[in-house]
Amino acid sequence: MRDELNKGLIDFLKASPTPFHATATLVQHFEAAGFQRLDERDTWAIETGGRYYVTRNDSSIVAIRMGRQSPLTGGIRMVGAHTDSPCLRVKPQPELQRQGFWQLGVEVYGGALLAPWFDRDLSLAGRVTFRRDGKVESQLIDFKLPIAVIPNLAIHLNRTANEGWTINPQNELPPILAQVAGDERADFRALLTDQLAREHGLNADVVLDYELSFYDTQSAAVVGLNGDFLAGARLDNLLSCFAGMQALLNTESDETALLVCTDHEEVGSSSACGADGAMLEQIVQRLLPSSEDYVRTIQKSLLISADNAHGIHPNYADKHDANHGPKLNAGPVIKVNSNQRYATNSETAGFFRHLCMAEEVPVQSFVVRSDMGCGSTIGPITASHLGIRTVDIGLPTFAMHSIRELAGSHDLAHLVKVLGAFYASHELP
């Protein structure tokens, strides 16, 4: 099971270089399992035992498995994750021609570790909006090939590079695509028009706009002398999206279950398709049209917010509280923060610990050092919007927000197992 899941995750990561592609890949899996698309602009006819999914902005998805028992009776089991990761996004007017090179201006999306982006084989993917035959259309594209690079400055020209180096994103991050002749003018939109034709056979009249991100073309892989680790881009948080999908598709229950994978978590979630927007609340309200039933059901429900946790790094162990250093391959981590940066409380943590014990899955705890700030997740946001009880958990990870992150190769199976038990559980606290 472990090897099969790891291979599945590697394939999922390769197919999902952007939130748009991640959502499209999730859609493919759910449709293959018989889930039906619901359009938010249409009237819904929800059936007992039905399987559905809803997307918004092509970058967020909610998958729904209606139980044979009314959600008013047993509540709803929700798992939440996010589809976005820190990256470099192409600017609207990106063309730069300097010293005979064609470069693209980029904007840093989220809290990225910038140094690892240098000297990598980069490709480009995302969504393009264009006009064709007088109509506005959108399509996903992925160049797949390594078409760009951000070369480092040689140490001979930067003798203090290893003593600490502040990266200027405006000046130092524009990737190089090609060399150009002196009077040749690079045209990025023409490049996108050609890619639409090559990839989809579409003859666009004009490219109107785009949301495109650079990504590392190196595939994810199981690494380490004994294959102990899983290395790859976007583990935060496509690992949790994949685990939630596997758990939902491979469990049967009389209870209603949701997988919620939203965009824009890395930049605060405040968007129409983010956790701080109304998407999830509106969907659940349509499943439970009565306001009385909605409130009663939410109070019987529970959300597991799944997002990667900081594993204790052997070279930087002092960055963790000595009693709360999650180890790779030692199971999922319950995240706790007294200031509500995580939504976990004793009741929800106890229930998750109970699930892990019942499934013989190891479980750990994380609390940030008292002299350090704490990050947050979609957990507190969703808990406050819906009023739903929530536990924040995640798999321990090194190099979070780097271009290539590292997790334990045994932990994915642990997470899928306990999320499956949650979806199948007959009783919630």
Curated annotation (Swiss-Prot):
<dbReference type="GO" id="GO:0006508">
    <property type="term" value="P:proteolysis"/>
</dbReference>
<keyword id="KW-0862">Zinc</keyword>
<keyword id="KW-0479">Metal-binding</keyword>
<dbReference type="InterPro" id="IPR001948">
    <property type="entry name" value="Peptidase_M18"/>
</dbReference>
<dbReference type="GO" id="GO:0008270">
    <property type="term" value="F:zinc ion binding"/>
</dbReference>
<dbReference type="InterPro" id="IPR023358">
    <property type="entry name" value="Peptidase_M18_dom2"/>
</dbReference>
<feature type="binding site">
    <location>
        <position position="401"/>
    </location>
    <ligand>
        <name>Zn(2+)</name>
    </ligand>
</feature>
<dbReference type="Pfam" id="PF02127">
    <property type="entry name" value="Peptidase_M18"/>
</dbReference>
<keyword id="KW-0645">Protease</keyword>
<feature type="binding site">
    <location>
        <position position="82"/>
    </location>
    <ligand>
        <name>Zn(2+)</name>
    </ligand>
</feature>
<keyword id="KW-0482">Metalloprotease</keyword>
<dbReference type="InterPro" id="IPR022984">
    <property type="entry name" value="M18_aminopeptidase_2"/>
</dbReference>
<keyword id="KW-0031">Aminopeptidase</keyword>
<dbReference type="GO" id="GO:0005737">
    <property type="term" value="C:cytoplasm"/>
</dbReference>
<feature type="binding site">
    <location>
        <position position="156"/>
    </location>
    <ligand>
        <name>Zn(2+)</name>
    </ligand>
</feature>
<dbReference type="GO" id="GO:0008237">
    <property type="term" value="F:metallopeptidase activity"/>
</dbReference>
<comment type="similarity">
    <text>Belongs to the peptidase M18 family.</text>
</comment>
<dbReference type="GO" id="GO:0004177">
    <property type="term" value="F:aminopeptidase activity"/>
</dbReference>
<keyword id="KW-0378">Hydrolase</keyword>
<protein>
    <recommendedName>
        <fullName>Probable M18 family aminopeptidase 2</fullName>
        <ecNumber>3.4.11.-</ecNumber>
    </recommendedName>
</protein>
